[in-house]
Amino acid sequence: MFHNTCGRKGRFARAMGMALAISVTLSGCSTVSDWFADEEELEIRRLKPIDAKFTPSVKWDRDIGDGVDHYFSRLRPVYAYENLYAADRHGSVVAMNPENGDVLWERDFAVFEGDGWWDSIARLWRSGASARIGGISVADRLLFVGTENGVVMALDYETGETKWEASVPGEVLAAPSADEGILVVNTGAGTLFGFDTRTGEQLWRHEGDTPPLTLRGISGPVAANGGALIGTPTGKLQVNLLESGILAWETVIATPTGATELERIVDLDTTPVLFGGTIYTVSYNGTLAAVELRSGRIIWKREYGSYRNLSIEGNSIFVVDNNSNIYALDRRNGVELWSQGSLKSRSVTAATPVGEHIVVGDNWGFVHWIEQETGQIVARVDVGGDDEDDAIYDAPLNVDGVVVTMTRNGVVAAISTL
């Protein structure tokens, strides 16, 4: 919830990592962090045995930069036009072949302030001021990049060439979304923007309310069906007209309660899920809802709280709550089908449907396969070395049945079950 351009400081970091790994092995400990873990944390880290039905394996991995470090981030790879795109928070943007991880092109948007001989040497392991990339998406043969510095860029999907750049007054902490030639960008300042995808011209903006205290993060927008769907930090789900930005409707999903600002947090920080004519969303303080797209009418509500994105496969909706409990519900009526609590407190990611399973990552770099029908964990693989620095911090990506993950340290891995 945090090395080639694909890793300038990697030469030094990996050398140190090898030395540490040797010392750890000799001492008989699994990781350095074990030395400092209390019994409660060790209990969380001890995974319960499973009856594995298959054995996933890492097909390839690639270090694409410095990752997201300890920062909260929803930066994750994107698959489009038969290419895999990934970025690190610091500024590296990379296009890869999804079959083998080979780099097709790369850009570095980190800011360098000096050009002296010492700066040239220092760049071997550091890469300037962070571009603070917050999210990437692909549409209209363009790769869109949003940053916490309030910059939105469009890159050519084949070459990485910058096509246009715009500024917004606020942090872009979630991937933009595009439809019908309009790019929708949400900001931490509560303002929603519409840009022309081809030219970068600002078409509209919509000002929203921001309470005194909110979560670190924002709802990712969804541009679809002539609307821009968004969750707000005030507990509302809203739809703006895509062409003009005018508010079509808004519906209260969660209401503030409690005496303190902390108790009154009601953020809808997840990206809404549009399935058929229904929007699904969930609030941090405990409201999962299905809402009619045309009218904003609430179809059903249930008490589940989360800041993780929802996912849907068939008639099931999958929820990972604030404590890393995993649930499957019938999306038509909100009836709970099963729950899985054995990964509790492991900072589990949102679930990604892959075939007959859902796949989640966790805070110690493990990836788990769970049967959609039963909720049983049937396979797992260690991608991060049981180390929090290599946590899987956001939902895995499904690329034609191959699971792609990214660790906090910036390692993109493709995992096969064949």
Swiss-Prot record:
GO biological processes: Gram-negative-bacterium-type cell outer membrane assembly; protein insertion into membrane
Lipid-attached positions, S-diacylglycerol cysteine: 29
Residues linked to a lipid group, N-palmitoyl cysteine type: 29
Main localization of the protein described in the UniProt heading: membrane
Subcellular location: Cell outer membrane
GO terms for cellular component: cell outer membrane
Gene3D superfamilies cross-referenced by the UniProt entry: YVTN repeat-like/Quinoprotein amine dehydrogenase
Keywords: Cell outer membrane, Lipoprotein, Membrane, Palmitate, Signal
Pfam families per record: PQQ_2
Keyword hit for Transcription regulation: no
Signal peptide interval: 1-28
Membrane topology: Lipid-anchor
Subunit (UniProt): Part of the Bam complex.
Role summary: Part of the outer membrane protein assembly complex, which is involved in assembly and insertion of beta-barrel proteins into the outer membrane.
PANTHER family: CELL SURFACE PROTEIN, OUTER MEMBRANE PROTEIN ASSEMBLY FACTOR BAMB
Family to which this protein belongs: Belongs to the BamB family.
Protein name in the entry: Outer membrane protein assembly factor BamB
Native source organism of the sequence: Alteromonas naphthalenivorans
